[in-house]
Amino acid sequence: MEDLQDFLRGKKYKKIKFTVLKTQHLLIKGKINGVKGNFILGTGASDSCVGFESIEHFKLDAQFSETKAAGAGATGIETQLAKNNEIQLGRWKNKKFHLIVFDMSHVNEALTHYKTKPVDGIIGADVLLKGKAIIDYS
């Protein structure tokens, strides 16, 4: 009987490695616009996002947005929107990727409180749905 990895490989799925942090978050490495970054894989985040400090780092063209973000204990957070970026996770790529840009300091403060390195952003359900992701913890 074939195992899950062989089955998914046959269906053209691409394997993307992740690390489980001390906080039980999943950490994945990726690239936005060709620039490397570290991201939390956030199944509860509806949209992928990065912090304001990452605008230049990832070469984003971020524009004002009237949308307010909420999550991880915060609400009414000011946002910007960066459209049409390229994301690469492992060998999986998407060239029309939109990002929410907001103040991620509360996320990174929580990580550093547990002696975990800060992250550049969160990969959300938008990417997971687009890539038809299957998360295998084994």
Tell what function each PLM region has.
Residues 1-138:
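Pepsin/retropepsin-fold aspartyl endopeptidases
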